[in-house]
Amino acid sequence: KELAELREKEQLAANAVLGIKETIFLRYPDGELAPSIALRKDLTRLIRQFKPDTVSTGNPEGWFYGDEYLNHPDHRAAAQAACEAVFPSAGTRLIFTDLLAAGYEPHEVRRLYIHGTEKSNTWVDITATMDIKIKALQQHASQVDPNEVGKWMTEWAEPRSGRSRSKRG
């Protein structure tokens, strides 16, 4: 419980750095997330509630990122549930009819961006926002060494930066 409270505080601090004004915590246990029907339903409800044009999530199939690191099982589970919430769940009246009865009308997401895939077809130049990304990640001190974040983010981003269709700054 203490770790969960700490992680929420860290996330709120990171979101403040990024200018994110509202955060919704679903409060599933850390380290135990599964791509369950309950999680998919929660995400479907949020999609129907907020009606986003775009959803961005991780790669549900991404176990390894090159030789860099092993992807956390919670991240894979969240990504799978997010993809399944986008399609087919959020856009149809046939799934989660109780959400429909509660006033959550189906909503079709127009774009789904999946990051962390070896088959990427979109690259975005993050040069202009790298410092703020690093500062936001530094807020997660229980998960990463704040003094090392800048180094490993730069090492991670630099080889990918040439793939961006934008000019580098």
Question: Predicted segments — roles?
Answer:
Residues 1-53:
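Active-site rim/loop-helix segments in enzyme catalytic domains that contact anionic ligands
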Residues 36-169:
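Metal-dependent de-N-acetylase/amidase catalytic core
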